[in-house]
């Protein structure tokens, strides 16, 4: 799939971003336009959702070691309510969480 070289979200991503609210923003990570949220020591990347049928993927990254995801959810349907519920749970668990080398 070809992605735009600009930092513009697709219409489907814009709808999801609007649904998620002002705590989320657009970002460009590894050449892909994504939805992003900073949680302090962790960050959330919401990938995919570029077209009507493309699934959504959610990644939680430890900001001190960005080579390692600490949680991921792949091939999620574009069910905004379900995605928001999952993200709310992730936010509760990772906001202000101290780094833990035993994860």
Task: Outline where the language-model segments fall.
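C-terminal alpha-helix
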Residues: 89-93, 97
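A short, charged, amphipathic alpha-helix used as a generic interaction element across diverse proteins
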Residues: 79-90
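A short, structured beta-strand/loop element
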Residues: 42-63
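Negatively charged, low-complexity tracts enriched in Asp/Glu with abundant Ser/Thr
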Residues: 1-40, 61-81, 97-103
